[in-house]
Amino acid sequence: MRKILIVGGSRGIGNALLSKLVEENKIINISRIPPSLSHVNLTHHTCDVLTDELPTVEEVDSIVYCPGSINLKPISRLKLEDFRNDFEINVIGAVKTIQQYLPVLKRGNKPSIVLFSTVATTLGMPFHASVSAAKSAVEGLVKSLGAELAP
């Protein structure tokens, strides 16, 4: 049974993953609100990854980072704070999570890290400037981590 740490498992993609994986895996969920699902294989920690201290985890085989936010506005209505918030949630939160749990992850069974991007990084979709910029940074982070951490 794999031990999977999901950040952002209370809604959206994170919740769908949690629901799909919880039957056959031990899931540790970190999110600001608890998921609606309750299961013997699920442990939840209420935590804001950006502002709170992350909980101690003894064992983990995979990290899945998927807190959700999307700021769909025309560039004329986006504020610099919107860009900062999207970057903080998508990049800084992922880096904080990875740095915190990497020593434990390296001891895991076939360790893996999963981060999410958006098709807007390659298609250039309208109203996606802020999230596309943040997710492009996530893609760069993934490439760098792959080169650094691959066996």
Regions found by a protein language model. Name each.
Residues P103, A147-E148:
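Alpha-helical segment proximal to the catalytic Tyr-Lys
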Residues L78, G124-S132, S144:
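Active-site loop-to-helix junction immediately N-terminal to the catalytic Tyr of the SDR YXXXK motif
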